Amino acid sequence: MWHRALGPGWKLLLALALTSLQGARGAEEEPSSDGSFQVVTFKWHHVQDPYIIALWILVASLAKIVFHLSHKVTSIVPESALLIVLGLVLGGIVWAADHIASFTLTPTLFFFYLLPPIVLDAGYFMPNRLFFGNLGTILLYAVIGTIWNAATTGLSLYGVFLSGLMGELKIGLLDFLLFGSLIAAVDPVAVLAVFEEVHVNEVLFIIVFGESLLNDAVTVVLYNVFESFVTLGGDAVTGVDCVKGIVSFFVVSLGGTLVGVIFAFLLSLVTRFTKHVRIIEPGFVFVISYLSYLTSEMLSLSSILAITFCGICCQKYVKANISEQSATTVRYTMKMLASGAETIIFMFLGISAVNPDIWTWNTAFVLLTLVFISVYRAIGVVLQTWILNRYRMVQLETIDQVVMSYGGLRGAVAYALVVLLDEKKVKEKNLFVSTTLIVVFFTVIFQGLTIKPLVQWLKVKRSEHREPKLNEKLHGRAFDHILSAIEDISGQIGHNYLRDKWSNFDRKFLSKVLMRRSAQKSRDRILNVFHELNLKDAISYVAEGERRGSLAFIRSPSTDNMVNVDFNTPRPSTVEASVSYFLRENVSAVCLDMQSLEQRRRSIRDTEDMVTHHTLQQYLYKPRQEYKHLYSRHELTPNEDEKQDKEIFHRTMRKRLESFKSAKLGINQNKKAAKLYKRERAQKRRNSSIPNGKLPMENLAHNYTIKEKDLELSEHEEATNYEEISGGIEFLASVTQDVASDSGAGIDNPVFSPDEDLDPSILSRVPPWLSPGETVVPSQRARVQIPNSPSNFRRLTPFRLSNKSVDSFLQADGHEEQLQPAAPESTHM
């Protein structure tokens, strides 16, 4: 199976090797000297580099497909380990074909092209609250823990070397400390690759992953300091140089963070003004973020910290400013680049190892390095956790400490740093490279294989991938305010106090500068919750009737149609429905001309088609159709779903505001609606050409359109957009013939429109399929008991602290029910 599965990859690699040989042999060949015209010429040297890059990307992508063909393999072996093994196999094939290590993971390729998309993806999708809530813990592990691991590993190896167990090596104390500094850092790429498959709880994951990101500053400083000391020589190092090394740590870390924040501010500001160039919005996100990385490298600062904090700080404002299509493009492109870069890194780690020229073996040095990095990692975690648990509210248990100690994975960062060493200054560079590769393979393959069974055996709390309920959000928000108030009253400055102050500062200053005004309104918490409740209630209101079988009764817009609903007719059984559905699916001819269908003699199926057609046309939004738009490089087709959501929201908001106003001022909406209905009816009699001045009552349907003139919009663009949605037509409750109309105003659905005041005798009809305990279905009960509009639903009422509270809204509604006349009244807004 594996031979067949890897066949395409081997064929591509063999073709790559053969073409490389042919290109090497024929690169210097002169063109034909006979002077004749050649129809086809072979120019391998002309496309060699991009062709090889494309082939390697294709091989890496095919490898991911092959690995995931068998879920059993990927559930046991991490994908990073499989990629390293694949790299070893491919590297062996390339070496056997050419005996030259043609393809290796170079530091330039890694640091400038493969690492930035991975770190940007991690920063842009970082859970900010979880990250900053554990920032103190992360910084302690990243700074103190990395220094501890580097110093103890280097000094321990130097002590063993002095004992003579390693034999004769041309290494000094500074060389051992240099090696300890590059091998001590936890690699973010390896941690992401392994821990995302384990699915540990969020706190444990953010601590280990945050440590792997933030220890870059410590690693870079230690590496540069000890490399400079090795260049100067141990005798030339003074105390001033040590002080400069300590100062450089703060400059590198804080400087890289500041560069990232500045570019995040610039990116957020740019995306605020991209309303008319939506198509290039994703380009700004990637280019400006990458510039933050390059700028930090240019200034010798921490580039990983720069691009990480650029993604962390800009995500809130960028997501609010850019369009939905651009946000989707950014999300998928960023994930694609990060996944592809991670795949190439691990595969090239395996390929780079197949090079006999870099291998120098020393058993004592290699084995003791593995022992020391594991032991000192565990000791450092235990000591630091003991200190942290004295101040943390949620303490880290022993099981969490075991996983953190075992999760100290090394990866391509250590390999790239060791390859950068100058062989003239570090005599045993090949020994360091060989040991680093062994450490990377051991941590990624062995620890990656065993960490998942270890987590299951220790019963570590796993992450829950679900959306928190509204009740959980409400209580979490309330607890945040309570804890912030307690800290404020007691005079203590804690996480909740700082978070509350930052939220106020962001709302008053940053959001006004970096975010569009329309985005500020749309991000309002109350309106977001209101919008979610509105959509949920609308969906459940319709679905409730469908489950009960009373959808036709609920959606019937006129009195006559409601009278014509025969509840005594038995409903078809499940078998009949399935047979009917089967026959309908296999019918070849379907009549789509609804006008001719209505005029001719109708069968049962034709009647059903006609009713379904009119129901969908009148009460639901138009389904998506394939429009043929002209090609444009600068514009995208607007998403109709956004208009639908906005229209539902604004229409329901207006009805609830009117309900609130009427309840507060004691205005009887029925009397007001009766006057409006009489005035409209008189106007219709005067203007209509219908004989005797009477309106026909057959097939009546209420058509509603609305123009939101009174809606206060802050910007011209919002008013323009909304006029496009609503159609800009004055609202009139009119009675027209039941024709297949296509109103540009949006929905004309009684579910979202005001209820019709109907004859009580009609509303009192009870469907026969209900049990004695249920007089009417819940959705029908909502129509009958509440006379005015859906805004009187208990869940759709204006915001209250409790469903059980008896406020002015319920009292006003109950008073109106008592005063409602028996005669039906007009439809009103």
Swiss-Prot record:
Protein name, entry field: Sodium/hydrogen exchanger 3
For this UniProt record, give its keywords in alphabetical order, as a comma-separated list: Antiport, Cell membrane, Endosome, Ion transport, Membrane, Phosphoprotein, Signal, Sodium, Sodium transport, Transmembrane, Transmembrane helix, Transport
Family (UniProt): Belongs to the monovalent cation:proton antiporter 1 (CPA1) transporter (TC 2.A.36) family.
Phosphoserine-modified residues are 550, 558, 588, 603, 659, 714, 805, 808
- Per its UniProt entry, which superkingdom is the organism in? Eukaryota
Q: Name one GO cellular component term.
A: vesicle
Q: How does it sit in the membrane?
A: Multi-pass membrane protein
For this UniProt entry, the molecular function terms from Gene Ontology, in alphabetical order, are: identical protein binding; PDZ domain binding; phosphatidylinositol binding; sodium:proton antiporter activity
In which compartments does the protein localize? Apical cell membrane; Cell membrane; Recycling endosome membrane; Early endosome membrane
Signal peptide feature range: 1-26
- Which chemical reaction does it catalyze? Na(+)(in) + H(+)(out) = Na(+)(out) + H(+)(in)
Transmembrane regions: 47-69, 78-97, 107-124, 128-163, 177-198, 201-232, 240-274, 277-299, 302-318, 326-354, 363-384, 398-421, 429-462
How does the record comment on the protein's domains? Answer: The C-terminal intracellular domain is subject to extensive post-translational modifications and binding partner interactions which regulate transporter activity, scaffolding functions, downstream events and localization.
Per UniProt, what is the name of the gene that codes for the protein in this document?
Slc9a3
UniProt topological domain (Cytoplasmic) ranges: 70-77, 125-127, 199-200, 275-276, 319-325, 385-397, 463-829
Q: Where is this region: Interaction with NHERF4?
A: 586-663
**How is this protein organized at the quaternary level?**
Homodimer. Found in the forms of complex and dynamic macromolecular complexes. Binds NHERF1 and NHERF2. Interacts with CHP1; this interaction increases trafficking and activity of SLC9A3 at the plasma membrane. Interacts with CHP2 and SHANK2. Interacts with PDZK1 (via C-terminal PDZ domain). Interacts with NHERF4 and interactions decrease in response to elevated calcium ion levels. Interacts with AHCYL1; the interaction is required for SLC9A3 activity. Interacts with EZR; interaction targets SLC9A3 to the apical membrane.
- Role, per record: Plasma membrane Na(+)/H(+) antiporter. Exchanges intracellular H(+) ions for extracellular Na(+) in 1:1 stoichiometry, playing a key role in salt and fluid absorption and pH homeostasis. Major apical Na(+)/H(+) exchanger in kidney and intestine playing an important role in renal and intestine Na(+) absorption and blood pressure regulation.
* Organism of this sequence: Mus musculus
Q: Activity regulation per the record?
A: Seems to switch between active and inactive modes in response to various stimuli. Activated directly or indirectly by membrane phosphatidylinositol (PIs). Regulated by a variety of auxiliary proteins, which facilitate the maturation, cell surface expression and function of the transporter. Inhibited specifically by the drug tenapanor.
Per the UniProt entry, what is one GO biological process? regulation of pH
PTM description: Phosphorylated by PKA, which inhibits activity. Phosphorylation at Ser-659 by SGK1 is associated with increased abundance at the cell membrane. Phosphorylation at Ser-714 by CSNK2A1 regulates SLC9A3 activity through the formation of multiple signaling complexes.
Q: What happens when the gene is disrupted?
A: Deficient mice have diarrhea associated with proximal tubular acidosis and hypotension. Males are infertile.
Where do the annotations place a 1,2-diacyl-sn-glycero-3-phospho-(1D-myo-inositol) binding? 133, 136-137, 393, 492-493, 495
Which parts of this chain are annotated as the region Disordered? 677-696
Q: Where is this region: Interaction with EZR?
A: 571-585
Membrane-side (Extracellular) residue stretches: 27-46, 98-106, 164-176, 233-239, 300-301, 355-362, 422-428
